Amino acid sequence: MIGLLIQDNQYEQDIRELLMSFYPGETYAHEVKDGLGFYVETRLGDSAVSVLIWENGAAPEGWKLSDSRTRPSDLSDHSATKNVIKKMFYLMLAARTGKEMPWGSLTGIRPTKIALTRLEEGWKEEDIRSFMKETYLASDDKIDLSIEIAAREKKLLEPLDYERGYSLYVGIPFCPTTC
């Protein structure tokens, strides 16, 4: 069982999905109690976001990360703050477990949506690659795959007037660990 001590609950689902990638099948507690393997904690401060992993009641320095690039004005941007928290948790969990996930810290979103949005905004493929590598720590293979699929999707959607017409969305589960 893993303890979740999260200062702002709006990030709990994102953190739990990331933990599920590294520790499938684990259960979670929202309080300090005996019998937990370890705790994960987020702290949103005035000048930084911190994430910690607590083991045996102590928070070793090796499992604490802070990102001071996230200033208070940026904390109002939920998406940017979430990405910083998830990236820091991913780095800590990868170091702790020795595992790396091919999609990096990406959970709960269709990866091609990120690439497609940027292609539609006129971004170059190399800029999308850099963004996905820096923001989500995704592998080169998965970044290439998402850009390739997004380019195909863009080509299919360009001749359609999908903004004023009708769309049919068929949801197909992508990741069995979160669906």
Tell me what each language-model feature is:
Residues 108-111:
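N-terminal alpha-helical segment
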